[in-house]
Structure formats: C-alpha cells, structure tokens
C-alpha cells in the first residue's frame, strides 16, 4: 500500500510540473525555445542606377550567383547525378574536385561549402529548373546572390560618375555626392532553423520578411551621352594632336546651368588616378577673361558703348610694362574692336578707371574665389588675394586674365554670367531622382544666384564677342547661318620663378545664338606643343562640338530645337508598371512595352542579360518583337521601334 501511495504521489508531482511548465510558464518557455532556434538574415538591396538624360544607363548593380551546399544533406547515392547536372551547365566545372570536397566536408559534418564558380542569371536559372524536376537532387544545394557595380562605357564618364570603395560606398564623383540616395536599405528575413552548426537562409522554416529590402534610388543626369561622347572624342584628338599635358572641356545650357557634357584627358589608369580636371585643376585664363573686365567697367559706368581706348602697344604700370600681342590693337579702339582683337593695354586702361574695391567686388559677384557648388565631389577653388594686397600691378594683370587662378568651371560660369542677361546661375549634373517605382522624388531646378550685370551690359558684351567670330581672333568658329559669339585666350603658365617661356594654356569660349544664348562651351588645352594660340588649338574642337550639337538636336539659328519631338503623354501604365516590366524581363517573359519612353526602356531593360537587341528611333515604343507574353532567353533577338 505504501508503494502505491508513493507512485500515486509521484504521478501527481509529474502532472503538477507539467501543468506549471505548459500552462503557467508555457508562453515563457515557448519564447525561450523560439529564441534558441530563431535566426535573422540580411537581404541585400541594390544600389540605384545612374542614367544619362537621353536614357543611357552608366552604372548599375548586376547580379551574380554563388552555388553553396550543405554537404550533410547531399545523398551520396545521388552525388554523381548531381555532378553531371552541374557539369552540363558550367563548362569549367571540375567534377572530381567538387565531389571530393563534398565528401570531405560531409565526413567532417561541415554544413557549408561554397563552390568557386560565379554564375550568371541564365546559368543559375537552368540549374534551378533542373533541380526542381528531380527532388532527390535539390536537397542541400542553394544559391547566394551577389551584387557587383557595373560601369558601361566608363572611359568618357569615369571622372564624373566616380567609383565605390570595398564597402560599396561612393568615394568620388556623383557616386559619392549622391551616396545616400543611391544606397538602398537591406531587408531582413526571419525564420526558424533545425539545430545545426551552420545555418543559411535556405535552411529556415516558416520564413517571413520582417523588413523589406528597398533598392536605392535612380539618378537621371543632365548629361547627354551623345554630346558627352562628342566632347570627349574632340578632347582626345586635340590632346593627342598637340601632345598636351592635359585637355578639358565643358558644354552647358546657358539659362539653366545644366551641364550637358564635361570631360578631360588624359584618362585615369586606375581609380586612384581619377580626376575631374574641369573642377579640380587651376589655371590662369588669359584673354578669355577680358569680357568680364569690360562688363564690369560698363556696369560701374566708367566706360560706355561709345568709349574709345587709345593704345601705343604698351603701357607701364608701376615698375612693369604690359605689351599687346601684336600691332592689330594699337591706335584708337572701340570696345568692340578691343574685344575682337584682344588688346591687353586697353584692358589695363579700363581697369585703371575703376576703384580697386569696385573691381574686386565684381570678381566676387561673378563667382570667383569660391566654389560653384556643383553637385559632385572634389570641386576645388582658390581664394582671391586679399583686397589689401590688390596692387595696381596685380589689378592690371587680372584685367587681361593673368595673375588670377580658377577652375575651368569657375571661368565658364563667370563668362556665362556676362552673356546670360547678367545672371549668375548654379551649375548642376543631376536632373532628377526617381524611386524604384519610377516616381520622381526630387527634381533639381535652375537657381539664379545673383543678378550681376544689367541686360544692356550683357547685350553689348554679347555683340562684342560676336565680333570676335565675325572679324576678330575667332573667325574660324563661324558656322553658316548661325550667330556665334566667342573669345580666344592664350595664357602663359606661371611657375616657381615667374612665367615660363613656351608654356601656355590655350582656350576658346563660345556661345550661341548671340541674341538669346542657349548653349555655351569652354575648351582649354594645357601646354600644347607646336601651335599654342587659342584660335589655333582650342577653337577647332569647339566648332566641331557645336556643329554636332546643332545637327543632333535639330537646332535652328534662333537656338530652338525644330526637330519634331514625340509629345510626352502621361501614361498610367508606364508610371505604375515599370517595376512589373522589370520583373517580367527577370522572369524571361517579354513585357508589353508600348507607350513607354526610350529613357524608361533603358532604365528597366537588362542589357547584359538580353544582349541581342536593337532599338530604332526615339520617343515612345510603338512596335516590338517578340510580342508581349512570349518566352525569351539570352539568345532571343529583340527589336524595339520608337517614334
């Protein structure tokens, strides 16, 4: 009887403990158990794309895939069959090595083996499809996704786009300036795992994505790829022809400050050498600076449209003598002839009419001595010398573009102020930013920083610079039917011991149309060998770029784009379903592309995956082959017609 009581009490104790554990402490123990086997894994996000204004993708994150295995889950009886499957899809696959590694890891009870093969999308999908057909092979084989930054046609854009560091962060150019916008937000997958030493996301059970991965935003630039290639090629040819130290150029919209093209030579051999010279390299501009001196004198009222300046060809300033470059600028010169023939003495005389403080003030007003604020990394600037140090000699030198250093972009923006109805605008490279669904989340707009010169002063200077092209030092820039304004510049380079004989910066600035300027360009060649005058060295590539611009855009002499453009139609389909189009491409299904623009097409079209494609025309998609819904693969020939 005693034993029965003991057994009965034992059962009561067990039941009481079970009740305590399961009912009273049940939730607590369940949570503890879940915590023991709960795992979270990061889902990588893609960095945003960088796209030109005409729709060419310059930078994007491409997907590659690693094969990873859990050797303990692979059935030894099926290993040969698995090796055969992988060999049929990976040409360089080493069957004996991989088989040996799997068996060795399995004996060691190792849960993770990454094969040394990087797969593209089609290879990965083919293997996945075959594994799905044979369930006996699928166990223990997984894929890990990697993102690699790809740059397309990088040579012409390298110094503008920049590059990333090993942590996928921008360290130069637009990649750095807009790093926060381009960087996505990684997601998190949570689930329960079976007990094992190594866990992958593929071994999780009851998974859920508790934080969705959000890809980075896409940047649409002001740059036009055709104009960028044109400018870049002209700089290359000039750089090589004159065996120069460097060459740089910028093409911009006058009224808006949009940069349409910006490039330089020589090109960097590696990331450490990347340098955006138009915003980093300082130079003395020489005679291209003279319109600023004349505009300042007119604005201050020390000269007017009727002013005539007398020159004997030389002038003494303190203990220095300033000479004209030749006899064409001696005698009595109107302001128009002074600019057209590029006289130095006349500029000194105009500067002497101004109070030093006033002259200095206008140097600041046109943006010299401070950065332009362009939206890219590494812009430099040299401060103006202190006002107290502005001697008569220094003021006289600056009047004709010597003794003052600036970047090419600073010089262009200052000259642009003179021709742009007196308005100093802020230059920019990014037009707008779009999110993953194609919604514009930020739109840059033209910014007028200051109204520096009156309309009358600007108009007079535009016509003075037109005379440079019609009868002065820049006559080679004439384009039949178009009113071009310009200014040549040849500046002797300064060194440690003063100005260096035989070393020059050769420049040419131009704009059109004269009455209401739309486009402006500045090209500068550093130390050309052979010829060195701006009219001989820098003018020809400027003219070539303008000729290409006029033809490409269909621009009439008034600066209006006359080529009939397809009117932009707001189509709910393209705004709502660009993401779906991208997904259908990803799933090897031809989407319905009708109605979307070339820019949108290029933003979602996977060029590397479907490389056999042809796009015809511009505007919006009108016809496509294959038809929507057709299965496609890497060998499919795709043709898109736009109007």
Which sequence ranges carry the predicted segments?
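A short, polar/charged loop-to-alpha-helix boundary motif
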Residues: 67-82, 267-280
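Hydrophobic alpha-helical transmembrane signal-anchor segments
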Residues: 1-28
